[in-house]
Each structure stands twice: as C-alpha cells, then as structure tokens.
Amino acid sequence: MEYIIEPMKPEDWEQVQAVYLEGIATGHATFEAEVPGWEKWDSSHLAEPRLVVRVRGSVAGWAALSRVSARRVYAGVTEVSIYVGSPFRGQGIGDALLAALINASEKAGIWTMQAGIFPENLSSIELHKKHGFRVLGIREKVGKMTFGELQGKWRDVVLMERRSKVAGID
C-alpha cells in the first residue's frame, strides 16, 4: 500500500477527527467520549511533531504528542497519541507512523515518550514494544468509562515508556 507521512495541518482536522472518532468507538483507545473541537485539541498537543499518514490523498491515521507536565524539568517528556483508521489497521501504517513520530520527536529534543494503553488493546501494546517502549506497570482502575458498553466500569491502563538514545543524553 502506498502512503505518505507528512506534518498535520489545521485543514486536516475534519479527517483527523473522523479517525479519532473511530478509535473512540472501539472503547479501547481512550477515555474520551467524544472528539474535542480543534481549539481544545490544538492547545493540548505540542505544535510539532504532529503527523498524518495519507493513503490516496485521505488521512488514514495520525500521531501527536502532548506534555505530561508543565514543569520545566519535564520539558522533554511527552505522551503519545496515535490512531489509525479501521480500514488501514494491520497494514503497517501504525508502524511507519510511530517510527516517524519517534524520529521527529528526537529531532525536536524529546527524550522520553510515554503511552497509556488499555490492556485489551494488544495491537497497540505490541506496536509500542516493537519501537522500544517498555511496560513500566499497570495503573489500576485509573479512570471510569463514561460511554459505551463499558460505561461505569473502572479501567486499568498499561503505562509504557521509551527513552531516547539520541535526545537528552548529555
């Protein structure tokens, strides 16, 4: 399958939103019950890197980073968001997208990437492991689902982390 990975632009938001909504609908991608508006999403994610993967000109997936803390000492520590549209899952797009995000993050001086993943999302856990993330532990009953068939249920989250061998090594 031919695809291209490039920086996300505000004009991509409608398609990014659609992919995000597909992830939400699985019940195993996020605690979010709905896609936030552009302004809220934009303000909660780093300006760079933000990536989209396009197949035949349409957004098939996206990845972005957000800060884990406003404290200066954690300036290079981020949380990963990565979503692939359902028709494109299992075809290597997530693999290429996460590799590109890691590369871009290291160029931006990010030294640690974290991911919080529901234990049921085995494909995401395996994808992150493939790219050097390790399991730090399980955050037990960290939040309650507010929607879907798991509404009202406490959920565990697998906390994973990748420490760069390039950025922040001084």
Regions found by a protein language model. Give the residues of each.
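Glycine-rich acetyl-CoA-binding "A-motif" of GNAT/NAT acetyltransferases
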Residues: 58-62, 123, 154
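Conserved acetyl-CoA-binding loop-helix of GNAT-fold acetyltransferases
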Residues: 90-103, 126-130
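A short beta-loop-alpha structural element at the N-terminal edge
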Residues: 2-16
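Conserved catalytic-core motifs of GNAT/GCN5-like acyltransferases
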Residues: 64, 114-117, 125, 129, ...
